[in-house]
Amino acid sequence: MATLTVDFFCSVDGNGSAHGWPGYWGKEGPELRDYLVQKYAQDQVLVYGATTFRAFREFVADYDEPYYESLNALPKIVFSSTLREPLGWSNSTVISEDAVTAMARLKRETEKPMRSHGSISLNRALLAAGLVDFLEVTIFPAITGRAGYAALFEDGPEFDLDLVESTVLDGRTLKLVYVPHLHTGVPEGVGPQRRET
């Protein structure tokens, strides 16, 4: 069975984007670039919602990042009821059926790892359905405040997280990899205990 990793870049206050801020919140460094090159050099399937797919399709055409060649070469699927093939990005396939149903089937049918980046609505649904094996959060040293938007965890279900990897990139950006578990309540006896009188 394939694993699914949800990959989320965010500010310290949890926003995936911010008005008036550049890509990577202006904090891109050599270790971050090397990490991205290595990550996308791995054999995997990239998973997108329609909005993020359109954005990345434009990024790889208009910008020059060292890992974009790998993005072009890797197989990609986009969940969308409106997009039609040809999609204008090499090795891309559209899936129009319900994303949760389709992802559960895809995970059973293949061994190749899958990775979804951005795609807030899609990844909220996949997380809520318990289909995400790894949650990779890269936290950039910025607080975006009122300018921030696209928070993945806002208004969603609750999760307990097992930390399996932590790395500091360029001395300032934190990459955390978790195994998520839907939160089912706090066990009795956990947390501060009231003193008996």
Where are these regions (language model features)?
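Enzymes that bind and transform nitrogen-containing heteroaromatic metabolites
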Residues: 1-197
